[in-house]
Swiss-Prot record:
Primary location recorded for the protein, binned into one broad class: endoplasmic reticulum
Membrane protein topology class: Multi-pass membrane protein
GO cellular component terms listed in the entry, alphabetical order: endomembrane system; endoplasmic reticulum membrane
Protein name: Alpha-1,3/1,6-mannosyltransferase ALG2
Gene3D superfamilies registered for this protein in UniProt: Glycogen Phosphorylase B
Name of the gene this protein is made from: ALG2
Pathway of action: Protein modification; protein glycosylation
Annotated glycosylation sites: 94
Domain of life: Eukaryota
Length: 514
């Protein structure tokens, strides 16, 4: 085993999505190998995070949450960058940046050159879930122009990493198509699922018994309430299938839900409207309301008789219970970068119906005539009619072949997607990083110079007081032993009066011509 390292993971918002699940699993896996691990994040709500965070199994430090996530519902990427820069600035100020041997950064790469510059010897591994610029909406010319510098920044700053890894071969192919000026060959580190079964909380057993009758069979969808997840596909396929009209079946739709996120609220309403237009009996339960005072919670009248049940932000314990007993997981996103939920289902022997593109091509073994010993589900085109047929095919197949998926699923997941397998992949890539010399990429210098210029120009809003911002910046750089940059800022402090006169003279000269 390698010498224990002090490892920092930097992640923007430690919620309950797939990216956050990977961060938590990576942290636990590395910690179990004897490394000291700290997760730095700009936001972590203890009521909206994974159980390992709630229990305090991992050290989590929140920095920069005082900054807004958006400005009037816009400028999300700008605010995300500012929050991450505030986080790194705090690490520089308090000296924590020099305590870490390795930084694992994901989602947002803006801080990578800064980590290289201000850390005495730390290496940086960037985990690319998917190019951020492909996730951004560009509905107008203004939004397209607004994204241009951030797209370039993503590419340049990611290129400053010591190593880049991606979550699937699908993402790897997209990486090559997107980042054309980078000469990187990222390796694949698959996300994982914990093979150990989570203990099911008593309150969740009680919750389950309240919504599922003893003779009910249910189909399950688990995703965030976002339009790109195409949860409507599961809903429309279920109501078009024969199974959907059976008296003992229902559809459970669970989703990560945050009332602060407008799309979560809007999309849940859209799904409810689909049910109402089709005269499908449905009910919505916000799990957080139940979990606050479970002994006093009153379930909606006739909840067991509802055909569709929407559950918002359920606990990991309830999720485990639902996955274990589901008839079939309906995994609806198209071109999903990886998709962890199918693995969580297959771990319990629950078959999966997923779209035949993106990550599921690597995680779900579709049933064919010659692979009954390895099949874990079905891959089908994202069409409600085709999915309805697959749902009915599954029902017939499981009746004739009970136990097939209960054997195949867990074995497939354990062999390729366990936490041990993922940790081993991470350690292999970390070994490779430390086998080579630490190199500051030219991109890093360019980014730092650009940032210095922006800071210099921005500080002018403070008038003559900006001189002392220069002096403060220079002092911080001296403390961090970055003497050349410190000299630059001290010179600005000394020469500020002359620079101001020069700028005023040039402005006065050009003004009549303009």
């Amino acid at each position: 085993m390698m010498t224990p390292l002090n490892i920092a993971l930097i992640h923007p918002d430690l919620g309950i999505g797939g990216a956050e699940r990977l961060v938590v699993d990576a942290a636990i896996g590395l910690q179990d190998q004897g490394h000291r691990v700290t997760i730095y994040t700009s936001h972590c709500d203890k009521n909206h995070c994974f159980e390992e965070i709630k229990r305090g199994d991992l050290k989590v430090v929140v920095v920069g949450d005082f900054l807004p996530t958006n400005i009037l519902g816009k400028f999300f990427i700008l605010c995300a960058n500012l929050r991450q820069l505030a986080l790194v600035f705090k690490l520089v100020i308090n000296g924590s940046i020099d305590k870490h041997d390795l930084f694992i950064v994901d989602q947002l790469s803006t801080c990578v050159p800064l980590l290289h510059l201000f850390s005495a010897s730390g290496r940086v591994l960037f985990y690319c879930h998917f190019p951020d610029q492909l996730l951004a909406q560009r509905k107008s010319l203004v939004s397209k122009l607004y994204r241009v510098p951030f797209d370039l920044l993503e590419q340049l700053t990611m290129g400053c990493s010591d190593s880049v890894v991606v979550n699937s071969y699908f993402t790897r192919s997209v990486f090559f198509d997107t980042f054309k000026i980078l000469r990187l060959n990222p390796r694949v580190v698959y996300p994982c699922v914990a093979m150990d079964e989570l203990p099911i909380e008593k309150i969740d057993i009680g919750f389950y018994d309240q919504i599922i009758g003893p003779n009910n069979r249910y189909y399950l969808s688990i995703n965030r309430f976002e339009r790109k997840k195409d949860i409507a596909l599961a809903l429309n396929a279920f109501k078009a299938s024969k199974e959907g009209h059976s008296s003992d079946t229902k559809l459970i739709i669970c989703g990560g839900y945050d009332s602060r996120v407008a799309e979560n609220v809007e999309y849940l309403s859209e799904l409810q409207l689909i049910c109402e237009k089709a005269n499908i009996a449905h009910v919505t339960i916000f799990y957080s309301e139940f979990s606050r005072t479970p002994e006093h919670y009153t379930f909606p009248t006739g909840v067991r008789e509802k055909k569709v049940i929407f559950l918002a932000s359920i606990s990991s314990s309830l999720k485990e219970l639902l996955l274990k007993k589901a008839q079939l997981l309906l995994y609806t996103p198209s071109r999903e970068h990886f998709g962890i939920v199918p693995l969580e289902a297959m771990k319990h022997g629950t078959p999966v119906l997923a779209v035949d593109n993106g990550g599921p091509l690597e995680t779900v073994v579709t049933l064919k005539s010659d692979n009954q010993d390895t099949a874990t589900g079905w891959l089908r085109r994202a069409d409600a009619g085709i999915w309805a047929e697959a749902i009915d095919e599954q029902a017939e197949y499981v009746k004739k072949n009970p136990g097939i998926f209960a054997t195949n699923g867990p074995k497939w997941v354990k062999d390729k997607f366990s936490r041990d397998a993922m940790t081993s992949s991470f350690l292999h890539n970390i070994d490779n990083i430390f086998m080579t010399d630490r190199v500051i990429q030219p991109w890093a210098v360019m980014v730092i110079l650009a940032a210095s210029y922006i800071l210099w120009r921005s500080s002018h809003v403070f008038g003559d007081a900006c001189r002392y911002i220069y002096l403060l910046t220079g002092g911080i750089l001296v403390l961090r032993s970055r003497y050349l940059l410190a000299i630059f800022w001290v010179l600005l402090f000394v020469m500020q009066p002359q620079l101001s006169v020069g700028v005023d003279t040039i402005t006065a000269t050009l003004k009549p011509k303009l």
